[in-house]
Amino acid sequence: MSWIERILGRTSSSSSSSKSKVPEGVWTKCTSCEQVLYSEELKRNMHVCPKCNHHMRFDARTRLLSLLDQDSAQEIAAELEPQDVLKFKDLKKYKDRLTAAQKQTGEKDSFITMYGTLHNMPVVVASFNFEFMGGSMGSVVGAKFVRAAERALADNIPFICFSASGGARMQEALFSLMQMAKTSAILAKMREKGIPFISILTDPTLGGVSASLAMLGDINIAEPKALIGFAGPRVIEQTVREKLPEGFQRAEFLLEHGAIDMIVQRKDMRDTLARLCAKMTNKPTPFKTAELIVEEA
């Protein structure tokens, strides 16, 4: 081997070894613009692409903890865990699907509920976790939603819920469908008592969740370009045999047609929710807005 070959060989091997040392998960690709992004930067930006502003799916627990004031979160009904009472089996046993989802996400089910403060205002918050079986709604989701709503009723404080779900959990059959009525009933009780319920629809919000609790907010908010509807656009096109309008079932389309009240960027969500909660409970805005600063000047 010549001295040139020895040098080139050494350089090539050291280059390949350095490449192999790059750990997994350091880089990720935007699902919209396909730009390669540094994962830590994406986390700091709350999983919103800094290049195209695409709002990616967001872990439920991280979402709630970033919404609430630091160290104020107390989980509600954390002990509840789904059971395979029907011994359901499709391509896999339901209990095996649950075990796999729990291992993947570190959560017991697809729904997390918490009590805490938002800009020092007490609130109850909840979020679906789409990574857990598509954020599907089963018996535990219904039970946790009711427990959270009951806490809001008992303390006379707002209830905020983030939806990200494919709908009812088919593995629980009628038990799953019953949760649509169960969650709607407790929200009717909240409305009677004048307790605010704010619903935030994120990508995607579909099926039985969109047909029940997700669209029953006193104020319905969506994240930009969130897919919202009952059946997905492909299913509708195959059923009606017609091409759907561009952007059909996206948040902007729904806002234009009066189905939701507003679209809010993820970075603005915390302050927007705080202002709405203060307004709906007849409390002063918990922080000074630009408008207030101008008025005082």
Curated annotation (Swiss-Prot):
Its main location: cytoplasm. Residues 26-295 form the CoA carboxyltransferase N-terminal domain. Disulfide bonds: none annotated. It is an enzyme of class 2 (transferase). Residues 1-23 are annotated as: Disordered. One of its GO terms (biological process) is fatty acid biosynthetic process. Binds 1 zinc ion per subunit. Its EC number is 2.1.3.15. Keywords: ATP-binding, Cytoplasm, Fatty acid biosynthesis, Fatty acid metabolism, Lipid biosynthesis, Lipid metabolism, Metal-binding, Nucleotide-binding, Transferase, Zinc, Zinc-finger. GO terms for molecular function: acetyl-CoA carboxylase activity; ATP binding; carboxyl- or carbamoyltransferase activity; zinc ion binding. A zinc finger (C4-type) spans 30-52. SUPFAM superfamilies: ClpP/crotonase. Pathway: Lipid metabolism; malonyl-CoA biosynthesis; malonyl-CoA from acetyl-CoA: step 1/1. Zn(2+) binds at residues 30, 33, 49, 52. It comes from the Bacteria. HAMAP family: AcetylCoA_CT_beta. Component of the acetyl coenzyme A carboxylase (ACC) complex. Biotin carboxylase (BC) catalyzes the carboxylation of biotin on its carrier protein (BCCP) and then the CO(2) group is transferred by the transcarboxylase to acetyl-CoA to form malonyl-CoA. This is Acetyl-coenzyme A carboxylase carboxyl transferase subunit beta. It comes from Actinobacillus pleuropneumoniae serotype 5b (strain L20). The lineage of its organism: Bacteria, Pseudomonadati, Pseudomonadota, Gammaproteobacteria, Pasteurellales.
